[in-house]
């Protein structure tokens, strides 16, 4: 992967990328950024950042600063002298009386609430019993026409839901069968694909291992940007998009599907690891 590809994938300036590769950490502004840049670099090329930190911990600066002396100097170590407690002792009897009154009030309130709640429960139980007895007088016979109609309605609703699901599954299969994916050409690390033939187009990105991605719509607005973890999947309906650009920092770890069909890389991912995939929707406009 070239420095230009790494810069595009990680957003780190090339001079800092060169410094990372050469182990020249002094030109990077701050120890925190050294570790942050190394982590981004590792993710872009498919390496384990934690393993890198462990193997090169003697060379990579630590973000922890042992500045205990400065922190101690800024602390106020003066101890306050205990204040006279005589005034508090004078108020103690009054405080105890107030607390006692509060406790008594709380107990009385709890007793009243319990009594009201019990009366309410008894009243509700009596009402429910009366309603149950009333309903039992008008219970619908098991063989009545009304119950038969209810059963028929329930069966029809179940059949309708089943038929709707079957139609949806059939439509997805038809879209997948009618879909055509055509490689229109490559330029540098960019490959353009044209898709047509399907009424609905769904994009699916799945990472076999950590892989950074960026997805933009026809207006260059970001739809997704970040690192997909191992076995993580991103899906997006792009039926209404004229085109979608997909940038991957490490193509060997990323599988691209359209309507379930795997898109084959025109550029060998092992040779061109950072790639841009442009999906152009060639769906024909329906005449009015």
UniProtKB/Swiss-Prot annotation:
Biased composition (Basic and acidic residues): 136-146, 154-181
Membrane spanning stretches: 92-112
Keyword field: Cell membrane, Coiled coil, Membrane, Transmembrane, Transmembrane helix
Annotated compartments: Cell membrane
An example Gene Ontology molecular-function term: DNA binding
One Pfam family cited in the UniProt record for this chain: HTH_25
GO cellular component terms, A-Z: plasma membrane
Ranges where the record places region Disordered: 121-183
Topology in membrane: Single-pass membrane protein
Coiled-coil segments: 147-185
Record bears the keyword rRNA-binding: no
Superkingdom in the source lineage: Bacteria
Protein name per its UniProtKB record: Uncharacterized membrane protein YmfM
Native organism taxonomy: Bacteria, Bacillati, Bacillota, Bacilli, Bacillales
Gene name in the database record: ymfM
């Amino acid at each position: 992967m070239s420095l230009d590809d790494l810069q595009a994938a990680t957003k780190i300036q090339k001079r800092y990328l060169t410094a990372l590769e050469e182990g020249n950490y002094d030109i990077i502004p701050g120890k925190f950024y050294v570790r942050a840049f190394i982590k981004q670099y590792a993710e872009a090329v498919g390496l384990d950042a934690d393993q890198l930190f462990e193997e090169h911990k003697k060379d990579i600066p630590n973000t922890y600063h042992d500045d205990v002396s400065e922190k101690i100097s800024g602390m106020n170590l003066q101890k306050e002298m205990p204040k006279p407690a005589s005034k508090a002792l004078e108020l103690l009897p009054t405080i105890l009386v107030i607390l006692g009154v509060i406790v008594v009030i709380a107990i009385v309130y709890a007793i009243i609430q319990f009594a009201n709640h019990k009366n309410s429960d008894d009243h509700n139980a009596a009402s429910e019993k009366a309603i149950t007895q009333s309903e039992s007088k008008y219970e619908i016979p098991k063989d009545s026409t009304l119950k038969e109609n209810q059963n028929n309605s329930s069966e029809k609703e179940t059949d309708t839901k089943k038929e709707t699901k079957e139609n949806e599954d059939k439509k997805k299969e038809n879209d997948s069968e009618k879909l055509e994916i055509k490689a229109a050409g490559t330029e540098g690390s960019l490959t353009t694909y044209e898709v047509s033939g399907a009424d609905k187009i769904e994009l699916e990105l799945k990472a076999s291992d950590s892989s950074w991605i960026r997805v933009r719509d026809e207006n260059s607005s970001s739809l997704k940007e970040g690192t997909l973890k191992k076995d993580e999947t991103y899906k997006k309906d792009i039926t209404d998009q004229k085109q979608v650009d997909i940038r991957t920092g490490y193509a060997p770890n990323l599988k691209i599907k359209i309507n379930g069909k795997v898109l084959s890389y025109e550029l060998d991912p092992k040779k061109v690891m950072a790639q841009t995939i442009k999906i152009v929707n060639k769906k024909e406009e329906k005449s009015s």
